[in-house]
Amino acid sequence: MKAVVLAVAVLFLTGSQARHFWQQDDPQTSWDRVKDFATVYVDAIKDSGRDYVSQFESSALGQQLNLKLVDNWDTVGTTVGRLQEQLGPVTQEFWSNLEKDTDWLREEMNKDLEEVKKQVQPYLDQFQTKWQEEMEHYRQKVGPLGAELREGARQKLQDLQERLVPVGEDIRDRMRTHVDALRSNLSPYSDKMRERLAQHLAKLKDSTTLAEYRTKASNHLQTLSEKAKPALEDLRQGLTPMLESFRATIMGWIDETSKRLSTQ
């Protein structure tokens, strides 16, 4: 059981904070993790999209149209990159304000979770002890059978398998009993935790705190929208000439094709 708990802990540690331990860096914030994931995702899309554009431009039709799609694609990538740089601090400020405004709720829930954890810990320790006892019981039963297999070689393999079946069923039934007992012991605490959460939400709904939080969230969103407008306008101005050039090229090609067809 300790190995299972340790494995899960290592999994989460490796997935979130381990690299900061080895690098001696400060742990990433929630916004930093989201930003890193989004950056990797967008970069992957840009790289794969550029490959498709390059393939089309190399085709006969692409060479005939001469749209310079790869150059335009790189221009779009550069413009979007500038947009990300401009919006990064604004968005980070939004998340920071949001986290500050919800600190009180997280603190209340953490207190309840810590209290429940202390109450259920004896049941978890008891379950771990029972688990270890059953594993030792299982090893004692299986050990002699393994020795017989080594001595009797292959002809006794089928007999060994038949003798292992009831042992496996026995350990399964015994562990199922312990799991059911643990579930029964923890059930009241799960219900209590749900009740406390419902009480917190009801209290939040009836208090002025929720109205204040809604106002703050609305203000944060409004601020984010206002600060993002210049960056979005820069993006629009950067893309407009490229789109107009693209449209003019396509229309010219259509007119030329129509003239050729009409003269035939």
Curated annotation (Swiss-Prot):
sequence repeat segments run: 67-88, 89-110, 111-121, 122-143, 144-165, 166-187, 188-207, 208-229, 230-240, 241-264
* Record keywords: Cholesterol metabolism, Glycoprotein, HDL, Lipid metabolism, Lipid transport, Lipoprotein, Oxidation, Palmitate, Phosphoprotein, Repeat, Secreted, Signal, Steroid metabolism, Sterol metabolism, Transport
User: Species name for this entry?
Assistant: Peromyscus maniculatus bairdii
How this chain assembles, per its entry, is: Homodimer. Interacts with APOA1BP and CLU. Component of a sperm activating protein complex (SPAP), consisting of APOA1, an immunoglobulin heavy chain, an immunoglobulin light chain and albumin. Interacts with NDRG1. Interacts with SCGB3A2. Interacts with NAXE and YJEFN3.
What Pfam families would the database entry show? Apolipoprotein
Alphabetical list of InterPro entries matching this protein: ApoA_E, Apolipoprotein_A1/A4/E
Family, as annotated: Belongs to the apolipoprotein A1/A4/E family.
Any GO CC annotation of this UniProt entry:
very-low-density lipoprotein particle
Query: What PTM annotation applies here?
Result: Glycosylated. Palmitoylated.
Q: Which GO terms describe its molecular function?
A: cholesterol transfer activity; phosphatidylcholine-sterol O-acyltransferase activator activity; phospholipid binding; protein homodimerization activity
Name positions with the PTM Methionine sulfoxide.
Answer: M109, M193, M242
Q: Which residues form the signal peptide?
A: 1-18
What is the stated purpose of this protein? Answer: Participates in the reverse transport of cholesterol from tissues to the liver for excretion by promoting cholesterol efflux from tissues and by acting as a cofactor for the lecithin cholesterol acyltransferase (LCAT). As part of the SPAP complex, activates spermatozoa motility.
Region called 10 X approximate tandem repeats, residue ranges: 67-264
Subcellular localization is given as: Secreted
Keyword Signal among record annotations: yes
Looking at the record's lineage, which domain of life comes first? Eukaryota
Q: What is this protein called?
A: Apolipoprotein A-I
Q: Its encoding gene is what?
A: Apoa1
Q: Check the record and name the PANTHER family matching this protein.
A: APOLIPOPROTEIN, APOLIPOPROTEIN A-I
**A Gene Ontology biological process term:** cholesterol metabolic process
